[in-house]
Amino acid sequence: MYTADAHCDALLKIAQSDSPLVNIDTLKKGGVGLQNFALFAPVESSIYEQQEMIKKEITLFHMCVKQSDNLHSNPFTFIKNDNTYTDAILSLEGAGMLGDNLDMWNDLKNKGVEMASLTWNERNNLAAGSSQPNRYGLTRAGKKVIQWQNNNNIVTDTAHLNEQSFWQVIELADTVVVSHTNTRALLDHPRNITDKQVAALVNKNGFIGLTFYPLFINGTNRADFSDFGRQVEHLCSIGASDIIGLGSDFDGISSTINGLSNPSDYPALINWLLARFDENIVEGLVGENFRKFWNRRRIKR
């Protein structure tokens, strides 16, 4: 079954000379036809160090694509329902190192970035992250960047934003996703989203990627397929079945769902889901919803 993942941190792992869970071999074994690779630089680093890390990860991304026949990247083509290879998307997770420098934003776009979030968990010069009080939201610079994203058909990722920033993005941005999150109805965690936020994303024709991080799923260090299934069941019950998908956060989380250690384990998850949900729901969840969302975005070019 065609599989797509809206978020992983493999590029940071490679940049730090570590072996990523998301790699050519595991993507192929898992039948992954579409993978978003996030550019991320630790926010405790200096602005210069963050900028250099992002440059390094961009170079590594294009090197990986060039060296592998199984990894394709072309922001100007439609994504086919074909998992004999993996279409690779490039995104930016946290943009404090760019601020509202539009020359730098244009440079990232020219290097293939198609989606970006304004901040990580912290408050920066653009927005407030999920660890911040809701009295903080988008800054004037952040609103300027949202307008630039609209003008350049860049998807705005609201993962890691606090609620105040989220609602401002919903009001201002044309194309919105939450690339990796879970539902707050089942676990009240600031990185999870409320049913009201889910409804806003449905109305916006957005996308929600579900993580495999137990701490966001059930608040512990251990979760299994049934815990993940409850996330899916709840979101389907409130009308979100057409906009939910996978947002694994592989290579960015310290633990994952039991039996789902890397992308090669996706067939086991799919088989478990097929035994409990309608096939069309499972097809949408594991890949088709994200693929269709991305093609709707690319048709605007």
Could you say what each language-model-derived stretch is?
Residues 2-5, 34, 87-91, 114-115, ...:
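Structural preference for beta-strand elements that scaffold enzyme active sites
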Residues 7-11, 40-42, 91-95, 121-123, ...:
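Active-site beta-loop-alpha junctions enriched in small/polar residues
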Residues 7, 27, 112, 156, ...:
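Conserved, mostly hydrophobic/aromatic
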Residues 1-36:
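An N-terminally biased module of ancient metal coordination in phosphate/nucleic-acid-related enzymes
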Residues 26-103, 130-136, 140-143, 147, ...:
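A metal-dependent hydrolase metal-coordination microenvironment
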Residues 239-260:
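Short acidic/histidine-rich active-site segments
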Residues 261-301:
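Mid-to-C-terminal alpha-helical segments outside catalytic/metal-binding sites
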Residues 100-110, 132-177, 190-204, 226-242:
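Histidine/acidic residue-rich metal-binding segments in metalloenzymes
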